[in-house]
Amino acid sequence: MGKVLSKIFGNKEMRILMLGLDAAGKTTILYKLKLGQSVTTIPTVGFNVETVTYKNVKFNVWDVGGQDKIRPLWRHYYTGTQGLIFVVDCADRDRIDEARQELHRIINDREMRDAIILIFANKQDLPDAMKPHEIQEKLGLTRIRDRNWYVQPSCATTGDGLYEGLTWLTSNYKS
C-alpha cells in the first residue's frame, strides 16, 4: 500500500552513500541537513545513518568514516546504493590525489555501477579552497562518461550548496 501511495503522491526514497576522506565534512553535512544546525563532530568510526526528507524524497543517508584504516570497509555499504555523495575538502590540496584514487576505486566497483555521483566541493568558505572546475579536473571526472555526475560547491557549516545538491540528486535519479 505504501508503494501505491508513494506513486500517487510522488514520495520517493533514495539510498545515499556519503563517502570521502577523513575530515572532509561528511558528518557535518549529514547533521546540517538533518537538524538544520552545525554540530561539533568527532572522527566517525563506523557509520551514521539518518533519513533526510526534502522535496517529497526520503534520502536514507549512510555517512561512513573516512580514515584510511577503515576505507576497505566502504564496499560493505555499496549494495543498493542509488546515489553516491563524495565529499571533498577543497582546502586540502595535499590529499586531492588520494581523494581521486578513492573516488575511482568506489565508482569502478560493479556494485556501484548504477549510482549517480554528487561531489560536494566542501569548505568553499576557506581561503585558497579549490573551485568546482578545479575539483572536476583534479578528480578526473571528465573521464566518467557512463553515468551522471555533478560537482556542487558547498560549505557544511553554513549549509551553502547542500540543498542544491539534493535537488540535483532528485532530478537525476530514475527510480
Swiss-Prot record:
It is found in: Cytoplasm, Cytosol; Cell membrane; Endosome membrane; Recycling endosome membrane. GTP binds at residues 23-28, 41-44, 63-67, 122-125, 155-156. GO terms for cellular component: cell cortex; cleavage furrow; cytoplasm; cytosol; endocytic vesicle; endosome; filopodium membrane; Flemming body. It is an enzyme of class 3 (hydrolase). It comes from the Eukaryota. Its EC number is 3.6.5.2. GO terms for molecular function: G protein activity; GDP binding; GTP binding; signaling adaptor activity; thioesterase binding. It is a lipid-anchor. InterPro entries: Arf6 (IPR041838), P-loop_NTPase (IPR027417), Small_GTP-bd (IPR005225), Small_GTPase_ARF (IPR024156), Small_GTPase_ARF/SAR (IPR006689). PANTHER family: ADP RIBOSYLATION FACTOR-RELATED (PTHR11711). This is ADP-ribosylation factor 6. It comes from Gallus gallus (Chicken). The lineage of its organism: Eukaryota, Metazoa, Chordata, Craniata, Vertebrata. The gene is ARF6.
